[in-house]
Amino acid sequence: AGLGFERSDFDRPTKELSGGWRMRIELAKILLKKPSLFLLDEPTNHLDIESIQWLETFLASYRGAVVLVSHDRAFLDNVTTRTIEISLGKIYDYKVPWSEFVELRKERREQQIAAYRNQQKMIEDTEKFIERFRYKATKAVQVQSKIKQLNKIDRLEVDEEDFSKMNLKFPPSPRSGTNVVDAKELSKSYGDHTVLRKIDFRIHRGEKVAFVGRNGEGKTTFSRIIIGELGYEGHLKIGHNVKTGYFAQNQDELLNENKTVLETIDDAAKGDIRSKIRDMLGAFLFQGEDVDKKVKVLSGGERSRLALVRLLLEPHNLLVLDEPTNHLDMRSKDILKQALISYDGTLIVVSHDRDFLNGIVSKVYEFRNNTIREHLGGIYDFLRKKKIDNLKEIEKKDVPSKEKTGESTIGN
């Protein structure tokens, strides 16, 4: 149950399950073996927030060793006590969790830069001496000594460039109407399977909200209804002058495979941002010769990142983002997060990444049992309240809905 399976799922053939749910089965099989060492590569990618929290508790209290590859900050902070970074072919081992490591890495990079500059100055002075006295017989011994000195130098390197302070701003877009999306008694079914039942939903201009809930509860379905990809029953009105931008994991299919990475972004860039194209691509892990690769040779993750960068360059006043951080490293997520915080349009984001959502959204919509429930406040306000609600359920205390401040059920 911790990974989101209901008892009714236990007898279902695995061929009926999506790839994400099959990954959960594989994770459950590993956890049940109780090995002395867990090696988990991005274990949270196919989990919802509740399942991630359960896995955190399980791993944090596990008596064996746990090695994680993850880009989920909150998950790492709640589970790990040691951080190992691989940078420029070297391994750095810190006996601290992620957040403390970030501060120590910052200090290390500052020290590296200072040492690198001092070494470069010494190399430059030595080369000038060699060039000046190369053909002077009285200095021949000194020149040869300096040449040997240069050849023996262990050249210092500085860790990869830190793009976290890169200021990415969305291009200006037209102002939309006050009511951006207005749904009333909206329902959606796939055959006999009901996903959404008579839900009401309204988002106003400038609001930033999160869609959360277990996989299969309708978050992506409702997102696709909003952008016009899926039919529905009931009423849905998109506001005046709304220009929608949508990102999902399959958006990479819309890219022109015969264009290069740089050409793809150059076509979308307008105005002052054009001068920052290469920096943007570098921030999203396209560096050096990568920008000259054809789209058709990129991996699925690379295509997904490229589609996201292109979206950020286009003028939209409503953004609907479905798991935008799945293929991003932490620096890329930071840049995207800061851009979304300063974004003056309307935002709907489907995500299980608590650290990413924190500071962006001011309202959370929980998808559960074919309805959506509105929670005022940020993602951690929602999670704190969920813990209280779960305790109330365990204690079987009935709380009248009128007493549930900051929360309302939207749907019948």
Region roles according to the model:
Residues A1-Y116, K165, F170-N412:
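ABC ATP-binding cassette signature C-motif
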Residues L104-D159:
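Intracellular alpha-helical coupling/juxtamembrane segments of multi-pass membrane proteins
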